[in-house]
Swiss-Prot record:
Region of interest (Disordered), ranges: 459-485, 831-875
The protein's name in its UniProt record: Condensin complex subunit 3
Record's keyword annotation contains Cytoplasm: yes
Presence of the UniProt keyword Nucleus in the record: yes
Subcellular localization(s) per the UniProt record: Nucleus; Cytoplasm; Chromosome
Recorded GO CC terms: condensed chromosome; condensin complex; cytoplasm; cytosol; nucleus
Renumbered ranges of HEAT repeats: 55-76, 77-113, 117-154, 157-192, 222-259, 379-418, 516-554, 556-591, 740-778
Amino acid sequence: MSCIQIISSSQTSIAGHRKLCNKLFTLRTQEGFETDILRALNIILTVKKGNSNADRVLRFLVTFVNYLQQKDPEIDIVQPILKHILRGLDAKDKTVRYRCCQIIARVVNCVKEIDDDLYNTLKEKLLSRVLDRESIVRLEAVVALSRLQEDTGDEENDVRNILLFLLQNDPSSEVRRSVLLNIEVSNSTLPFILERARDVDAANRKCVYARVLPKIGDFRYLSIKKRVRILKWGLNDRDESVEKAAADMLAYQWIENADNNLLELLERLDVSNNSDVAVLAIKKFFDVRVDSLSQLEFPEQFWLELTAESSLLARTFNEICIEKNYTDLLDKMPEVVQLTYYIERQYVSLRDKSSYDESCFIIEQLLYIGLSQDMVDEIGRRKLLKSLTNSLSTMALPDSLISLHIELLRKLCSSENDFCSLLVEIITEVFEQGHSQNQTEEQGNSNAPELNKNDYEGEEITVSQKSPSPSLPPNELNEPEPDDMDGYKEAFNELRCLSYVQCLFENITSSLNENLYMVDMLKTLIIPAVRSHDLPIREKGLECLSLVCLLNADLAFENVPLYLHCYEKGSVVLKCTAIRTLTDMLIQHGKAKFTEYEDAISSILFEALGEFENAELQTLGAEAIAKLLVILHYRDELFLKPLIIQYFEPNTVDNHALRQVLGYFFPVYAFGAHENQWRIATIFCDALLSLLEIYRDLDEDDVQLSIGHIAQQMLDWTDNEKLYERKTQTGDDYIALNHNVHLHLANMIFESLPNASEGKERKFMISLLGKLKIPTDLPSSDYQRTKRKLETYESHGFTMDSTSLSILAKFERMLLQNEEARSKFEETEEERLMENAEENEHAGAEAISGEIIPDTVEANMEDEEEVYVKQEEDL
């Protein structure tokens, strides 16, 4: 067999490639051997992607090159092949460029050494091909170029830099995946690789967890921040395959790196600062390794030597057992009496400043366990209640523990009234501890009030007007004056009491008028705090007042001016509190209650939405408006256009929170109700013209999103086929909702065209007509109305280019065809109805003329006549 015949035989099957390699190897010394190899490659170059025969031939040739290098290294066939194929990298035919890159990628992989000149030529050519306009060419060029990577820390590494650029910016997900799999992992490339865990393509995200991260080896090479971020992204991914890949990586590879010790793995995640991710990681771990759950044991010594990691593991184990209904495994959890003892042990540990944070974290996990207990043990319930009450009264706990203590306290109390009574006693005791008797006498009023439900006439509480000074280094601290210390203690005590009050109102639902304790709290603590000159106290007081306002509509109405004033004159924190409170009050009590303040509330929401210098406040304003529109339809016509503009506004491109809020809001709003979709269509043109004006003044480098993409997104919101309820029933028929929304949109476009600037903007608005979905079964009057608007626009005599004229002519023909078809249908339908009416009328007349009186009716008439005659005779 000749060389060409052997190569031709390789296209039938891969199974015989080894034998064919041996046969071809015997011909290596023949004259023209190299030429035959190149001829075979030339044939492959013109074969399009997907041809299995060409792929098998190429695979055979690569196998032979590798085989030849092993058997006879003196024969160099690689250099001639590469030099020959390099000539085709600049070909006009995309198939040739694709095959050339593919051959280079396969052949270079077989080479251990390469000539410097050839290396530089290859690199130069491939650097241009990775930017090819065809994605299939870029894909193979990336594979080929990755073989030329140099393991250097030089920032001027051209190959690495271009691969990183493609990894971040290439529009093709397959090209990005190719870079991801082929780029070398190093300190300089690792951040870009991990970034692909947030890729828009699910296959790429899965690739990070299933193929790239295992190549790194021990996860401890990653920083704690990177470990937590990787787990958070993967385990929360919306795609099930990505989530499973991340869970498998955790449950098999990472646990193996931690010597199959779950506690050691948790130690590497810094659970004290990343408890949410750690809890999720444990749950996913046991989802994959279900058998390991029953193997966990919690002996007495475990509870006596709790750490942050072990306490979190116990809490998560308890939650899993409850969620999965593993009642037999729940027996491993301690009883309420034992749990109380373990909590009290950690209270003692709080005295040690070195372990304070860890002890707080452990107490938090034990309280979570307590929240899930059934509390049927009355002795245990009382002990735990006493322990929590004592800790709240005597210890300065962080806010996170205060909220959990009070939440558990609410569960332990039999009724809401008992809960309020108990917590009022605790607050009274805490308040008295922070105010000395001497201070009370000097002030001459009841500064430490007895919070009694029979006493509402107490004076306002006053606190020091001195704000705590900024912290200083230890060597610069001076001994504070006694008066200053008293002021600090009072302010701190006030904040502590207000934290208790805030948690109290967060855990009750009864009306303000039904609970006298709440009225007491309002008068003696909250109102004085709102009037305080200490900013932290005033902020906390306003938060507490907002919770009270949610329980009483009249109180909410009375305090609207206060929160409006807070927004106008207050700090950023107060502005955020004001927006949240006003929004919650509108949602809770209804917009009808606050009609008087509609303009004022709308004004501050507008102002917040335009706060470009404060991203948090701007996001909060957008979120508040979005809630009001979805839930209450609060002044849709006023807020909808500004929201759309802010969503696409170039200045908000870095405000990711705002984009996320609005990105969720618009589909929910548009597809949730057909009325909302109609509103979007109504303001479509006004919003788009405003955006055109904004984008007109931008430089090309500042444009993040083209106006065409913006219009396409807005058109998608007006697609009636995506409505949650697409049809409504009227009688026995179903009518499609918003069936004519795009015809309505066409009317709005014609009305807005005179307002658009001549040239590109007007041409762009006209081009939208070709993207509308106009149904053919609307009433003919609808088409006539749109046609009249088109004729009105044409009568203005605006100058238009040929493309715009063509679009308008095509749209007009479509309207005429639909109108004529529907007119004929309506005439036919009208004639049919008239015929049916005439037939029914004729049938009714025949029935009346041929009607016969029944015998029973005649008999009744005769009886009535006889009775009448008899009555006359009697008279």
